Swiss-Prot record:
Transmembrane segments: 8-28
Family note: To M.jannaschii MJ1495.
Bilayer topology annotation: Single-pass membrane protein
Organism from which the protein derives: Methanocaldococcus jannaschii (strain ATCC 43067 / DSM 2661 / JAL-1 / JCM 10045 / NBRC 100440) (Methanococcus jannaschii)
Location within or outside the cell: Membrane
Keyword line: Membrane, Transmembrane, Transmembrane helix
Pfam families: SDH_protease
GO CC annotation terms, alphabetical: membrane
Identification of the protein by name: Uncharacterized protein MJ0137
């Protein structure tokens, strides 16, 4: 009856269930994330033991969804460079470093810091690219003794960007139009653009000259910074080899397993699905 009082025990159980549900909703994501971190560390430990190296990762997933469903895009930041510099500094000097990179690029300052620290490491350094390392990611890869890429992975040009425009395009626009016809702001941008190109070009040259020799280092540094391609142009394994870069395609299987642990948490039906094993058809066809 509506007028009857609820049994105290029933009320307690109902309240307890609601509190447990509330606690679960709060704690479940944190527990899952902790489990994910432990799974990643397990693979990194296995890879480190297998290759007898210090394994460092810089993985920027682009599909992360932020508050209210707004995409959150990750790039190379100063915080990244600080963390990686600490990791390199802590690594044994006589032990190789494997740096796994998955990034669209980011701050030139941060990328140059990482590249410089990687090049200075006394033991062999290897950059592993399972999918892509564009812009600043390529700059870091050039600092390594060996670049290891998946057969379908790509690098990219390292020409500096000023706002939304490539520095080489700004310089070219002023040259074509004529300095006397350009406004003061454009001339200032062109001056900054020239300096930015020279700075990155010289940095790439210094990264490469010990390994490739002065002439080849000059050639590569010019090709990668002169604006020959758009900034998002994908430099494939084949093209990297044609340019003269020393590229290997033997990516350890553990790296692919690791990348699986960086997937976006499922919030809706995925847009890509596949069968990860051979399926036998009814008519006997393969």
């Amino acid at each position: 009856m509506w007028g009857e009082k609820m049994d105290p025990l029933s009320g307690f159980i109902s309240s307890l269930i609601w509190w447990l549900l509330f606690f679960y909703l709060i704690m479940a994501p944190q527990i899952q994330y902790k489990q994910l971190q432990l799974a990643r560390l397990k693979i990194l430990r296995e890879l480190s033991n297998k290759r007898n190296s210090t394994v460092i990762t810089m993985i920027h997933r682009q599909e992360s969804i932020g508050l209210f469903g707004i995409p959150v895009y990750k790039f190379i930041t100063i915080e990244d460079s600080e963390e990686i510099l600490r990791a390199i500094r802590a690594a044994p000097k006589d032990k190789p470093i494997d740096l796994i990179i998955h990034t669209p690029g980011g701050l030139v300052l941060a990328a140059t810091q990482i590249a410089k620290a990687l090049k200075a490491h006394p033991a062999e350094t290897r950059v592993i690219v399972p999918h892509y390392a564009m812009s600043g990611g390529t700059l870091i890869a050039l600092a390594a003794d060996k670049i290891i890429m998946d057969e379908n992975a790509v690098l990219g040009p390292v020409d500096p960007q000023l706002g939304q425009y490539p520095a080489p395009s700004i310089v070219k626009a002023v040259e074509q139009k004529g300095a006397d016809k350009a406004d003061d702001q454009t001339l200032i941008l062109a001056d900054i653009a020239k300096k930015a190109i020279n700075q990155v070009q010289n940095f790439v040259y210094n990264l490469l000259k010990d390994k490739y020799g002065e002439e080849k280092a000059k050639e590569l540094s010019k090709i990668l910074t002169e604006g020959r391609w758009t900034h998002d142009y994908p430099i494939t394994v084949e093209e990297a080899k044609e340019l003269g870069l020393d590229v290997d395609t033997n990516v350890p299987e553990e790296v692919y397993t690791l990348m699986e642990l960086y997937k976006q948490p499922v919030r809706q039906r995925g847009t890509v699905e596949f069968m990860p094993y051979p399926v036998k058809q009814e008519n006997g066809a393969k």
